[in-house]
Amino acid sequence: MQSLLAIADPTRRRIVELLAVRERTAGELVKEFDMSAPAISQHLNVLREAGLVTTRAEGQSRIQTLNPAGLDDVDAWLEKTRSVWSHRLDALERELRAEDERNARKKKKSSS
């Protein structure tokens, strides 16, 4: 669940979104934000530790790449949560329909 904690931060979510489009250097990422290179580096470290980002050396540059498999635990959690809410919403819908039917019967009885 470390990846879910990592993307709880809006800056890290935005980094993930940017890397989903294409890989970038840390310098390119710094230009996207109003923060220092060390601050972006700290965010990248959190994303790397969570398995969301990989870094490779290319000459003098460090290329940051999104690791989609790092989002698997987030996807699994969302699926589980979605399933729970789907069941709850289905039960609520059934209860509301039953309530509507009861009210319609009461109204019909009182108007007879």
Task: List each model region and its residues.
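C-terminal regulatory/oligomerization modules of transcriptional regulators
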Residues: 2, 18-32, 37, 49, ...
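Short helix-coil-helix linker/hinge
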Residues: 6-11
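Pre-recognition alpha-helix immediately N-terminal to the DNA-recognition helix
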Residues: 13-15
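Base-recognition residues in the alpha-helical recognition helix of bacterial helix-turn-helix
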Residues: 17, 42-45
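A composition/secondary-structure signal for short, hydrophobic, low-basic-content segments
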Residues: 38-39, 60
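A broad helix-preferring feature
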Residues: 45, 55-57
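Short, Lys/Arg-rich nucleic-acid/phosphate-binding segment
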Residues: 57-63
